[in-house]
Amino acid sequence: MIWNESIECMDRESLRKIQSIRLKKTVERVYHDTPFYRKKMQELGITPDDINSIDDIVKLPFTTKYDLRDNYPFGLCAVPMSQIVRIHASSGTTGKPTVVGYTRKDLSAWSECLSRAFTAYGAGSSDIFQVSYGYGLFTGGLGAHAGAENIGASVIPMSSGNTEKQITLMHDFGSTVLCCTPSYALYLADAIRDSGLPREEFKLKVGAFGAEPWTESMRRDIETKLGIKAFDIYGLSEIAGPGVGYECECQHGTHLNEDHYFPEIVDPKTLEPVAPGQTGELVFTHLTKEGMPLLRYRTKDLTALHYDKCSCGRTLVRMDRILGRSDDMLIIRGVNVFPTQIESVILEMPEFEPHYLLLVDRKNNTDTMELQVEVRPEYYSDEINKMLALKKKLVARLQSVLGLGVDVRLVEPRSIERSVGKAKRVIDNRKL
C-alpha cells in the first residue's frame, strides 16, 4: 500500500525540480533569519543567489551536532518562539541536550512522513498501535503516535518500560502494531514467553522498530519470536525523529522522504560526495522545515544510497541498512570494528541469545576486547568441554569476520542487564 502515490512514485526529474525550489526557499530563509547560517555562508563567500538548483547544495556549509550545542537552546531557530509549538531534545552522553523546535507545519509534515511509513508496512485504520517508544523529549513516542492517528488507527500510548503491563494490554486490547526499539522487542518477546500466555492469543502482525542499529539476523529473531513482520523505521531527532525513512514490503532498503529531507553521502574524512552505491556518511538538508531548518547536517551514520526504482513502485531513494556510526566505530589494534558486525555473528548462531556486552580496554599499551554473550538455556551446560567447544566456535567466527582475535566469555541466560530503551552494548574504557 502507498499513502501518497503522487510523491512516493514521482519521476526523478519532477522530484528534483521540487527539491530545487524548496532548497532555494530554505537557503533564503536561513540566510535572512538565522545569524549562524548567514555568517557561515558569508565566510564561504556565497549568498542565496548562488543556490539555483539542488546540484548547488555542495556549495553550502555543513552543520554538526556541536553547532547545535554551541547555539543552545534556540540559536538556530528561524522563526519567533511564538511560532514554535513543540520542543524536542536528545539527551547526549555529555553536555547539554540537542534541542529542536517545531512549528505546526513541521509537525504536520512529520506526521505525513510517518503515515507513508505505516502504510508501507501494511497498517491502516483498522489497526491498534501499541507505541512503546518513550514519550517526552525523545521524538519516538509522540512522533509514532501522531503518524498512527493520521492514518486513522487506534493508538495505545504505552511509552517505554512497565513490561508486565505492556504484555497485559497487548494481549487484552489486541494490539496489531508494535512500535519500539528492536532490543526492547526482543525483551518483550522473552517476557511474553515467560508469562505463560499462548502466543496465538496475541494479534500482533507488524513491528516498526528503530532508534538504534539492528541487523538482518536480529530481524529474523524478532519475527520468529513474535510471529510478526518486522520493519525498520529510520530517523534522528535533529532532522525529524522516526519517519525520515521507512522500509516498504520489498525490504530492499529504506526509502527516504527526500521531498522533505534531502540526503547526500560524503566521504567522512574529505567531506566530498561519493558515487551512488558507495558507502559514506549520511548528510541531510531540510527542504520544508520552518522551525529549525538545518543545512547539510552530518548524521555520522554510515550507509549508501540507491536511486533505481524499487519494485514496490516507489521512486524515492533507498538507503542501505546503517552499517554503524563514524563516531561509534572502534579501532582495535588498527582494525576498524563496528558493533553491528559482532551482533550479526551472534545472531547467526542459534546457541546464543541476542544479548551481549563488549568491553574495550587498553592494557600494557595494547587494545583488548572482551565479548560477554548469553548462551541460550537449551545450550547452556555445566560441562566444561561443551562450553569450551562453543566458545571456540564463536571465537573462530569472530576472527573470520573481524580479522582480529576477541576474548569471549560465555555467560548464563538473563545475566546481562536488559534495557527498555536503546541498549548499551559497548563500554570503551580506553584513555584515547
Where are the regions a protein language model picked out?
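AMP-binding/adenylate-forming
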Residues: R104-A117, I128-Y187
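Nucleotide 5′-phosphate-binding alpha/beta core
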Residues: M1-A89, T94-E112, R116-A120, N365-V373, ...
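Adenylate-forming
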Residues: Y184-K203, R220-T224
